[in-house]
Amino acid sequence: PPPPGPPGLPRIAGKGGISDYFFGASYGDSGTIPPPTPLHTKLSLQNDLRVLVHADPTFMAMNVLKRQFEGLFGTGISSRALSIDRLRQEILSNAARKSSRYDIIACDLPWFGELAQKGILRPIDDLLSEGNVDLGDFHRVALASARYRGEQCGLPVQTTPELLCVRRDLCDAAGIGVPFTISDTLETARALHSRSQGRSGIAWNAARGTPLGHTFMFVMGAMGRPFLNLAKIDDDYDAEWSTGENLRPVLQSEEAFATAEYLRELLDFSPVSILSMSWYERARAYADGEAAMAYCATLLAPLFELNKDSPAYGVTDFLPHPYGPGGKPIAPVGGYALAIPSNIEPNRVGAVWEALRSLTSPETIKLYIENGSLVTPRFSVSMDPDVRRISPVISIVDGMARSGVLQYWPRPPVPEITDLIEIIGTEIHDMLQGAKSVSAALADAQNRADALMRSRGHY
């Protein structure tokens, strides 16, 4: 018999193990999305379309397709790709210029609160009111992540949740099921951990600062509570409109302590380099067969989903974050949206909007996937038969978006999010190194985060 599924999620018949929980086959056949066609009139720009993006598979596909886009737009494209930290710095320094040196910028979803509050992004509601974008086709939480206090500031170009990737073949060989809960995950990691075979039980982000800060926030969300005291709405939390006391950190809560203890227990089944491991290293360890499981952003799934030499090729189950006693299955969303800088020359806005709309269209996002990306923020692209044949992960994420598993409240886009992540990731790293107790690390994180939010006048 099939293993039991996570609560509240239907099992859909099919092959391929647990991935079937989220497989998109039940949504009916969709038509095939055609390739992009040239714009009716070429973009009316005096010079090249200037784009600032992140160095990842989606934007690398955009770069590979540069000549094709130049043909579609009828103009040259000048593109610059930076690592995540350099990208944020460049966006901030560009905002200080009288006139933006970029027409379109790619923004990490949690940055939208900070960038919108500082007036760095041009709201696009007036452009959307023309009615030529089907907002209902986007994953709801990706669209909400690119909004700030009711104003839409960008359109998603990729949705890349962090999931638990599990080697189904190793679980089968060990006679165990794949994990759904936090306690399951510890047991599975223990069972599959084998130093003699050069394999760790699990790889995850435990590098100091930003990487570990993300892990803590996401796991605490799966324990059933965000790290800020966000207002509750039905079964979820308000990550858009919360103010005052609802922005107070809750790092002295039961869920925060449970998260810290869980991460400390994971150390025993983790790679020796775990305390310097971040996004790429953990995905690489999993892809190379050095870890039986990994918390992994789907953005990096091509390392094993499209690589036939990987031991994980074709034998990976993509699961939501394992949940704690008070939690439920969640997939914390990440990704990027394209936005227009507020200091762009006004006479460029019309043409740039045409380009941004085209670069986030179903036709173009399908093109990214055909050129090495495995992420889409659009339901229509996930349902395309050509796309579904490439990898099950695309349909799995689509199913999570439809069933409410995809969430952005574990890492809410508040203006201070970058600093808060850094604070938590620094204090918890001290704890994992043995320099502080769990209670001391959480007290220090609470005090520092609380001082930051007070200094910004939230309460």
Q: Predicted segment positions?
A:
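A structural signal for short loop-to-beta-strand junctions that line the ligand-binding cleft
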Residues: 93, 100-103, 131-170, 200, ...
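Extracytoplasmic/periplasmic substrate-recognition and gating elements
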Residues: 170-174, 243, 267-271, 296, ...
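Long, aromatic- and glycine/proline-rich binding clefts that accommodate carbohydrate-like moieties
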Residues: 35, 313-321, 370-426, 430, ...
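Periplasmic solute-binding protein
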Residues: 109-120, 125, 141-178, 206-244, ...
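Hinge/lid segment of periplasmic solute-binding proteins
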Residues: 24-41, 109-162, 315-319, 388-390, ...
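Extracytoplasmic "Venus flytrap"/periplasmic binding protein-like
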Residues: 68-138, 147, 169-180, 285, ...
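Conserved N-terminal structural module of periplasmic/extracytoplasmic solute-binding proteins
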Residues: 1-114, 132-133, 178, 347, ...
